[in-house]
């Protein structure tokens, strides 16, 4: 049941850009994971800001879970899943 308060809601920030095949794969992975884990997916186009382009331009896609980097480049579904599982276990303890 999805009933966490907003304070406990996990936020995945997904840094991406148009025309990025790795980003498309990563987004599919995140949407698949969202079926099993309750999180908000915040998608940010790095081209919306020179600062973001400079920071993440060579790394994208970049995935952060609650502000902590969980992966970049080729996003590993199992790594992200494990981090989400750890967070879920921590919230339920």
Named regions from a protein language model:
Residues 30, 34, 84:
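Conserved hydrophobic residues forming the short capping helix/wall of the S-adenosyl-L-methionine
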Residues 9-11, 36-40:
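A generic structural signal for alpha->beta connector loops
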Residues 5-31:
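Local sequence-structure signature of Cys/Sec-based thiol-disulfide redox active-site neighborhoods
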Residues 39-50:
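Thiol-based oxidoreductase modules, predominantly thioredoxin-like and allied folds used
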Residues 54-63:
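Structural micro-motif
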Residues 68-91:
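Non-catalytic, surface beta->alpha helical segment in thiol-disulfide oxidoreductase systems
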Residues 1-10, 89-93:
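Proteins that catalyze or organize thiol-disulfide redox chemistry
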